[in-house]
C-alpha cells in the first residue's frame, strides 16, 4: 500500500512540475496559441479542404457583357452557333453571335428569364420567374424573338428555374419553390405532346440546375437551398427505377446553381457566390474545378451557369461581379470532353 501511495505521490509531483514548466515557458515566450489566416483560408470563399487537391484550372475572360453588375443566366447555343443567355434584371434574352456582336432577342413582362433550352425546330424555351411574387412560367419564342407561346402558365403554380429537353422532345424543368426547411419545389416533366406535367422528384428546396446523362437514363438536379446534388435513375421519362435515387454530393458553402453535362457524362455545376465551377464524373464523384479570376479577392463570385459549345470542349461561364466593380463577364475554359449532343442539334425528321 505504501509503495502504491509513493508512486501516486511521485506522479502528482511530476504532473505539477510539468504544468509549472509549461506555464513558465508560456510566460517567458508569450506564445499563446492563435489562429491565423493563410493562403488557403484567406478570402471570402476559400476552397473547402476536401476539394483543394482536385485538378484545377483558371478560366480566361472571353466577352465583357456589361460594365454594370447585371446577373447573367442560362446560356445555350442555338443551331447557328450563336450564344443565347439571360439578362436577369433587364428581363431580356440576349444573343451573342460568333463574331461577338450582342443584341436583344426578346423582353419579358413581369418575369425575369433564368433558364434556356433550344428546341430542334429553333424555338427558344425560356424558364422565367418573379421572385418577389413567387410566380413563374415557361414560354417559347421563335429564333428572332417573335411568336411568343405560353408553354407552362403562371397559373400552374410553378417557379421554373432551369430546363433540359430529352431525346423525344419532352422537357424536364426545375421548380425553385421552397426554403431549406420547407421543400416545396422539385423536378417535373412536360410531355412531348404538351398535355401533361408529371412530378419526377418532388419535395426539393429551390430545385435549380437540371441535366440529363448522354443516354438519357440519369437525371441530375441541384438543390440550391440545401446544397445537394441528386441523381435519379429513370426507368422511363417519369418513373424512377428501383433503388434509383441518391444524393451523390453535399456541397460546402453557397450554393449549387445551374449545371451541364458533357459527352462523357461529366457534370459541370456552377457554384453561385463562389466564382467557380465544380466538375463531377458520371457517378457524381468530384474530379476537377474551374476557378474564375479574382475570386480570392471577392470578384466574379456570382457564377450562375455555363454552356459547352457544340462539337467542342469549349466551356463558357456567365458571371457577375456584384458590388466588385468589374461588371458582367463571360469566361472561357477547355474541359474534359466535348459537348453532349443536345436535342437542339439533333437532325429534324
Where are the regions that the model predicts?
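Bacterial N-terminal signal peptides
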Residues: 12-21
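A short beta-strand motif characteristic of beta-propeller blades
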Residues: 60-65, 101-107, 147-153, 196-201, ...
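Blade-level signature of beta-propeller repeat domains, shared across WD40, Kelch, NHL, RCC1
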Residues: 307-349
